[in-house]
Amino acid sequence: MDAATTRVGLTDLTFRLLRESFADAVSWVAKNLPARPAVPVLSGVLLTGSDNGLTISGFDYEVSAEAQVGAEIVSPGSVLVSGRLLSDITRALPNKPVGVHVEGNRVALTCGNARFSLPTMPVEDYPTLPTLPEETGLLPAELFAEAISQVAIAAGRDDTLPMLTGIRVEILGETVVLAATDRFRLAVRELKWSASSPDIEAAVLVPAKTLAEAAKAGIGGSDVRLSLGTGPGVGKDGLLGISGNGKRSTTRLLDAEFPKFRQLLPTEHTAVATMDVAELIEAIKLVALVADRGAQVRMEFADGSVRLSAGADDVGRAEEDLVVDYAGEPLTIAFNPTYLTDGLSSLRSERVSFGFTTAGKPALLRPVSGDDRPVAGLNGNGPFPAVSTDYVYLLMPVRLPG
């Protein structure tokens, strides 16, 4: 695929293709279109038919998306139409071949017995998509989707604090570290990938929303290619490219300083606990029914059990006891139930390990692996060294009453 869409002008573009592939590509491109574009043409998707098939493009000067689709191009050309409208139409069409052709300043779309006539926008006013930087490395699509979803959950959503709305991407040769925080929780994931150069080093801040959309929508295929440039020029374009399986997108990097997160991660704990993730999530949801939105869920840890409780006399109280492997002095700590279940769901593990210091300091959640030493085998009441793992979720507690 060309790095930037080639324009051949609004002509009598005519093509035929399968509804499913058309709808998937249009939906993927339209997801990134602005709700309130600065100029009308930025709400459109550009359809370009050529010898290479059909290219569907979208761009708002911050994020670009482009998908290549197999199609029978009867007559080449380009046309610009409303992206959200075309996405709604293609998703609702019956599962039959789709025919599209330009008629003057309108586009005719047919599928089975359904017919649509859509207005067009001026192709000549549409901006040229940015060129992808040089490829920096690649990794399996499933690993990319999992890792991004694990850290994006902790990213902030307040645009007045741009340094917290991004995912920090650190590259050191074959190792990539992803980190995100909203000040109340911090998620860090480390993974291996195939770097274009073994001595490559870079650290950039990428909008979390864009990366999360790319992970959820799925580039698909066996590998995802990340493009930030190579050599000393890594990240200097201020652009990240993501490509694979006939799709490519770019996003501008954030020009902000991410917090120094490693110093926040504890090296030892005064108490540790392991328990079943599914049971804990269900218990949190159950007792939180009597809590106001965002109110705390308390956890009282003792040898062999943890009591979850929530609520107050005026709204009702709830509690549930669960079995836990615990080492350390008895501890009572409280969390925002939504943030806690977010972290538990991100572990991708049947069991969770908690590492505590005090009731007023962050708790460290990590997945339990088969190599973990049983809590019952730990000596005394700590301190217990923090265990190295490829994913951690650091969560601030909520102040206990009184």
From Swiss-Prot:
Alphabetic keyword roster: Cytoplasm, DNA replication, DNA-binding, DNA-directed DNA polymerase, Nucleotidyltransferase, Transferase
Keyword Cytoplasm in annotation: yes
Pfam annotation, one family: DNA_pol3_beta_3
Protein localization: Cytoplasm
GO cellular component terms, A-Z: cytoplasm; DNA polymerase III complex
Gene3D superfamilies recorded: DNA Polymerase III, subunit A, domain 2
Entry-linked InterPro entries: DNA_clamp_sf, DNA_polIII_beta, DNA_polIII_beta_C, DNA_polIII_beta_cen, DNA_polIII_beta_N
GO terms, molecular function: 3'-5' exonuclease activity; DNA binding; DNA-directed DNA polymerase activity
GO biological process: DNA strand elongation involved in DNA replication
Record-stated family: Belongs to the beta sliding clamp family.
Subunit structure: Forms a ring-shaped head-to-tail homodimer around DNA which binds and tethers DNA polymerases and other proteins to the DNA. The DNA replisome complex has a single clamp-loading complex (3 tau and 1 each of delta, delta', psi and chi subunits) which binds 3 Pol III cores (1 core on the leading strand and 2 on the lagging strand) each with a beta sliding clamp dimer. Additional proteins in the replisome are other copies of gamma, psi and chi, Ssb, DNA helicase and RNA primase.
Function: Confers DNA tethering and processivity to DNA polymerases and other proteins. Acts as a clamp, forming a ring around DNA (a reaction catalyzed by the clamp-loading complex) which diffuses in an ATP-independent manner freely and bidirectionally along dsDNA. Initially characterized for its ability to contact the catalytic subunit of DNA polymerase III (Pol III), a complex, multichain enzyme responsible for most of the replicative synthesis in bacteria; Pol III exhibits 3'-5' exonuclease proofreading activity.
Protein name: Beta sliding clamp
